[in-house]
Design a protein with these regions (language model features):
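Histidine-dependent nucleotide/RNA phosphoesterase domain, centered on the 2H-phosphoesterase fold
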Residues: 1-135
Protein backbone atom coordinates (compact mmCIF):
# COMPACT_ATOMS: atom_id res chain seq x y z
CA UNK A 1 0.00 0.00 0.00
CA UNK A 2 2.80 2.45 0.78
CA UNK A 3 4.24 2.55 -2.77
CA UNK A 4 0.76 3.38 -4.14
CA UNK A 5 0.29 6.06 -1.47
CA UNK A 6 3.67 7.55 -2.35
CA UNK A 7 2.73 7.57 -6.05
CA UNK A 8 -0.60 9.27 -5.26
CA UNK A 9 1.21 11.95 -3.26
CA UNK A 10 3.66 12.46 -6.12
CA UNK A 11 0.74 12.84 -8.55
CA UNK A 12 -0.83 15.37 -6.20
CA UNK A 13 2.20 17.59 -6.66
CA UNK A 14 0.85 18.36 -10.15
CA UNK A 15 -1.84 20.46 -8.45
CA UNK A 16 0.78 23.01 -7.41
CA UNK A 17 0.82 24.15 -11.06
CA UNK A 18 -2.75 25.47 -10.66
CA UNK A 19 -3.33 29.15 -9.95
CA UNK A 20 -5.58 30.33 -7.11
CA UNK A 21 -9.09 31.22 -8.31
CA UNK A 22 -12.46 32.48 -7.12
CA UNK A 23 -15.21 29.91 -6.68
CA UNK A 24 -18.95 30.55 -6.50
CA UNK A 25 -21.23 27.83 -5.17
CA UNK A 26 -24.87 27.93 -6.21
CA UNK A 27 -27.72 25.56 -6.86
CA UNK A 28 -28.30 22.34 -4.99
CA UNK A 29 -28.82 18.83 -6.25
CA UNK A 30 -28.42 15.19 -5.42
CA UNK A 31 -26.65 12.13 -6.75
CA UNK A 32 -27.89 9.93 -8.35
CA UNK A 33 -31.04 12.10 -8.66
CA UNK A 34 -33.29 14.39 -6.64
CA UNK A 35 -35.94 11.66 -6.68
CA UNK A 36 -33.54 9.18 -5.07
CA UNK A 37 -31.02 11.34 -3.18
CA UNK A 38 -27.98 9.57 -1.73
CA UNK A 39 -25.59 12.53 -1.76
CA UNK A 40 -26.61 16.21 -1.46
CA UNK A 41 -24.39 18.76 -3.18
CA UNK A 42 -23.99 22.43 -4.08
CA UNK A 43 -22.83 23.14 -7.63
CA UNK A 44 -19.75 25.12 -8.59
CA UNK A 45 -20.54 27.87 -11.10
CA UNK A 46 -17.86 30.58 -11.34
CA UNK A 47 -14.51 28.81 -11.05
CA UNK A 48 -15.87 25.50 -12.36
CA UNK A 49 -13.52 25.54 -15.35
CA UNK A 50 -10.51 26.08 -13.07
CA UNK A 51 -11.65 23.17 -10.88
CA UNK A 52 -12.04 20.99 -13.95
CA UNK A 53 -8.55 21.95 -15.19
CA UNK A 54 -7.01 21.04 -11.82
CA UNK A 55 -8.91 17.74 -11.82
CA UNK A 56 -7.70 16.97 -15.34
CA UNK A 57 -4.11 17.80 -14.36
CA UNK A 58 -4.40 15.37 -11.42
CA UNK A 59 -6.06 12.70 -13.58
CA UNK A 60 -3.21 12.84 -16.09
CA UNK A 61 -0.58 12.56 -13.33
CA UNK A 62 -2.39 9.60 -11.73
CA UNK A 63 -2.89 7.86 -15.07
CA UNK A 64 0.80 8.34 -15.89
CA UNK A 65 1.59 6.49 -12.64
CA UNK A 66 -0.63 3.54 -13.54
CA UNK A 67 -3.71 4.29 -11.43
CA UNK A 68 -7.03 2.98 -12.73
CA UNK A 69 -9.40 5.96 -12.92
CA UNK A 70 -13.16 6.35 -12.93
CA UNK A 71 -14.68 6.74 -16.36
CA UNK A 72 -17.53 9.01 -15.33
CA UNK A 73 -17.10 12.71 -16.02
CA UNK A 74 -16.00 14.97 -13.16
CA UNK A 75 -18.77 17.36 -12.07
CA UNK A 76 -17.47 20.24 -9.91
CA UNK A 77 -19.45 20.37 -6.66
CA UNK A 78 -19.23 20.58 -2.88
CA UNK A 79 -20.69 17.55 -1.10
CA UNK A 80 -23.01 18.52 1.75
CA UNK A 81 -23.53 14.99 3.01
CA UNK A 82 -24.71 11.47 2.43
CA UNK A 83 -28.34 10.40 2.82
CA UNK A 84 -29.42 7.09 4.30
CA UNK A 85 -32.40 5.49 2.53
CA UNK A 86 -34.62 6.13 5.56
CA UNK A 87 -33.70 9.84 5.41
CA UNK A 88 -34.78 10.31 1.81
CA UNK A 89 -37.93 12.29 2.69
CA UNK A 90 -35.98 14.83 4.73
CA UNK A 91 -33.40 15.18 1.98
CA UNK A 92 -36.10 15.91 -0.58
CA UNK A 93 -37.60 18.56 1.73
CA UNK A 94 -34.15 20.13 2.22
CA UNK A 95 -33.63 20.28 -1.55
CA UNK A 96 -36.96 22.07 -1.89
CA UNK A 97 -36.15 24.84 0.62
CA UNK A 98 -32.46 25.58 -0.04
CA UNK A 99 -32.23 28.76 -2.16
CA UNK A 100 -31.21 28.28 -5.78
CA UNK A 101 -29.01 31.38 -6.13
CA UNK A 102 -25.45 32.06 -4.99
CA UNK A 103 -24.85 30.35 -1.65
CA UNK A 104 -21.13 30.98 -1.09
CA UNK A 105 -18.10 32.65 -2.63
CA UNK A 106 -14.47 31.99 -1.75
CA UNK A 107 -10.94 31.98 -3.12
CA UNK A 108 -9.46 28.52 -3.67
CA UNK A 109 -5.77 28.61 -2.79
CA UNK A 110 -4.98 24.89 -2.82
CA UNK A 111 -6.20 21.33 -2.54
CA UNK A 112 -5.92 18.67 0.14
CA UNK A 113 -5.52 14.93 -0.08
CA UNK A 114 -7.92 13.52 2.50
CA UNK A 115 -8.10 10.11 4.13
CA UNK A 116 -11.58 8.92 5.08
CA UNK A 117 -12.07 6.06 7.53
CA UNK A 118 -15.59 4.73 7.94
CA UNK A 119 -16.56 4.46 11.60
CA UNK A 120 -19.87 2.64 11.79
CA UNK A 121 -22.64 4.62 13.47
CA UNK A 122 -20.42 7.63 14.09
CA UNK A 123 -19.84 8.11 10.37
CA UNK A 124 -16.51 8.70 8.70
CA UNK A 125 -13.44 10.37 10.15
CA UNK A 126 -11.64 12.62 7.66
CA UNK A 127 -7.95 13.53 8.03
CA UNK A 128 -5.77 15.82 5.90
CA UNK A 129 -2.85 13.76 4.56
CA UNK A 130 -1.17 16.55 2.58
CA UNK A 131 -1.94 20.05 1.36
CA UNK A 132 -1.04 21.18 -2.15
CA UNK A 133 -0.99 24.99 -2.30
CA UNK A 134 -1.71 26.61 -5.65
CA UNK A 135 0.63 29.21 -7.11
Amino acid sequence: EQPAADEALAAGESLRESAAFDLVLSGVGAFPSTMRPRVLWIGATEGASELMAAAERLRAALEQRGFKLEERKFRPHLTLGRVRPQGEGGAKRALAVIPSGELARCTVRGACLMQSVLGGRSGATHTVVRMFPFR
